[in-house]
Amino acid sequence: MNPDFLDFEQPIAELEAKIEELRYVGDDAEVNIQEEISRLQAKCKSLTESIFSKLSAWQVAQLARHPRRPYTLDYIGRLFTDFEELHGDRAYADDAAIVGGMARFDGQPVVVIGHQKGRDTKEKIRRNFGMPRPEGYRKALRLMRLAERFRLPVFTFIDTPGAYPGVGAEERGQSEAIAMNLQVMAGLRTPVICTVIGEGGSGGALAIGVGDRVMMLQYSTYSVISPEGCASILWKSAERASDAAEALGITSARLKELGLIDTIIPEPLGGAHRNPEQMAGNLHTALAEALQTFSAMDTDALLERRYGRLMGYGEYKEG
């Protein structure tokens, strides 16, 4: 199976394999097979549109985890200039699962922070599979306070299965680190724009996800627990992850419907990994619009709006 394609994409993979085979034959043959290639390409596009028009929540979760999906550093390289990464929380250590630093966005100085997963085994281990420890969140907090001091807008990119639940992380105050970030971000006196680019896993995502605008890429997810974890608790079997994904309402469309996010950023046909440049362009447009909107606001008005947004989540009913 081609690793670029997920199980539900296999009909697409088979068509693309045929196209590649014809191209290979066409290079050596005297006959012109371009017409057949064009026909198959049109069929492939139509099939892809059909499959992606009716994705289940579980299939979206698989896309959000795709191994070739662009990560934070991929977007930083495409959207920002003069990026200078800063390291360490000035208390314990540097956590490579969180990256961040100073950069320029369309020439404007900003602070950018995000989760970072790994591509190969070595990098996955170094990045702890994108699961931050307390020092990662404290590093993010240090950068946000730095941004506030110099009145720099903050961009955060969310892509994590969740905060690391190891014994050492708990001993060093994982829950306190997350809670402190929530508190500080709610009152940060500078624009904060958050984007879920892959997995938005529970408190590990929320710890850099409180802002003036929360956006999601079309095939990203945001939930309190992974579908497998939920299924294991409710039905004692991770095999019912697809049922859990539907029940959790993890997709961007469902979360927008519930009012938990503000904007859905469209992805290229087939997902962000199929055309990272186009995805970066779509993301740039959304970030630029948000930055223009919130940079023009008075600080007190910005904070009042942010507080109102947070207090608008959910509803209270007396029994």
Curated annotation (Swiss-Prot):
Its EC number is 2.1.3.15. GO terms for molecular function: acetyl-CoA carboxylase activity; ATP binding; carboxyl- or carbamoyltransferase activity. Pfam families: ACCA. PROSITE patterns: COA_CT_CTER. InterPro entries: Acetyl_CoA_COase_a_su, ClpP/crotonase-like_dom_sf, COA_CT_C. GO terms for cellular component: acetyl-CoA carboxylase complex. Residues 32-293 form the CoA carboxyltransferase C-terminal domain. Belongs to the AccA family. Acetyl-CoA carboxylase is a heterohexamer composed of biotin carboxyl carrier protein (AccB), biotin carboxylase (AccC) and two subunits each of ACCase subunit alpha (AccA) and ACCase subunit beta (AccD). This is Acetyl-coenzyme A carboxylase carboxyl transferase subunit alpha.
